[in-house]
Amino acid sequence: MKIGSRVKHPRLGEGIIIDFCKYGGVLIDYSDDKGVLVRVSHRDTIEVIHE
């Protein structure tokens, strides 16, 4: 995993990694044409689609 990688969250869908936070958190941009959503998700809950 690195900044700019595409990832998938089971509930929130696909997103792009923006930054890494403390304690295993990853700041992910889940935004699409419906709106903007940027959230911190735990590293264990996401899977890498494209690095």
What are these regions (language model features)?
Residues 2-51:
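Basic/aromatic-rich interaction segments and small domains that mediate binding to polyanionic partners
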